[in-house]
């Protein structure tokens, strides 16, 4: 297994050489890529689509303007476009979310949007941000926390409970 992370791994020019080496020397090797999908060029995409075992770990947790703010200089429209591309491949995709005060409520809309666009409910991993403390959702007022809990409870009623995060990172 090779794990590419960043910052943004597609900004690292040497990673394209590594992908070419994998393709040439061991195309059955598992390649894990942790990316925000902001720099998926046609050249990189064309190289990766020839590999059999790729696990895309996509960092995102909010929609539209909120995504653009949190993941600046990323753009939600670019994420959607690139996600649509990689969904066409026979690769595994996991959405790795950081649940923080900036997306406390919007993360629920994000999950809905991703599911409506073809992702499976089991493709999400939510990481609670506790540090730095000012980004933690524990800073929400009591009323906002109650409202958030209510929204989560409502969402849970609409989810088929057979879906749960089980072996999401395993191949």
Features from the language model and the residues they span:
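Acidic (Asp/Glu)-rich catalytic clusters
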Residues: 22-23, 46-53, 87, 115-118
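Core AdoMet radical
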Residues: 1-13, 25-42, 49-80, 92-101, ...
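C-terminal accessory regions of radical SAM enzymes
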Residues: 119-171
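Short secondary-structure boundary/capping segments
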Residues: 18-19, 71-75, 109-114, 140-141
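Catalytic cores of alpha/beta
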Residues: 101-117
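Distinct, well-ordered alpha-helical segments
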Residues: 14-20, 42-48, 106-110
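Acidic-enriched, low-complexity/disordered segments with a strong bias for Aspartate over Glutamate
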Residues: 28, 109-113, 131, 147
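Short, well-ordered amphipathic alpha-helices
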Residues: 15-22, 79-84, 111-115
């Amino acid at each position: 297994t090779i794990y590419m992370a960043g910052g943004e791994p597609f900004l690292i020019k040497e990673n394209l050489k590594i992908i070419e080496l994998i393709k040439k020397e061991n195309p059955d090797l598992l390649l894990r890529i942790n990316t925000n999908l902001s720099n998926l060029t046609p050249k990189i995409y064309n190289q990766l689509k020839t590999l059999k075992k790729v696990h895309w770990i996509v960092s995102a947790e909010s929609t539209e303007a909120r995504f653009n703010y949190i993941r600046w200089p990323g753009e939600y429209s670019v994420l959607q476009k690139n996600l649509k591309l990689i969904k066409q491949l026979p690769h595994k995709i996991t959405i790795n979310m950081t649940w923080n005060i900036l997306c406390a409520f919007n993360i629920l809309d994000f999950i809905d949007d991703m599911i409506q666009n073809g992702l499976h409910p089991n493709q999400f991993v939510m990481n609670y941000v506790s540090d730095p403390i000012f980004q933690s959702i524990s800073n929400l007022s009591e009323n906002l926390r109650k409202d958030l809990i209510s929204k989560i409870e409502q969402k849970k009623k609409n989810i088929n409970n057979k879906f749960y995060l089980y072996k999401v990172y395993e191949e």
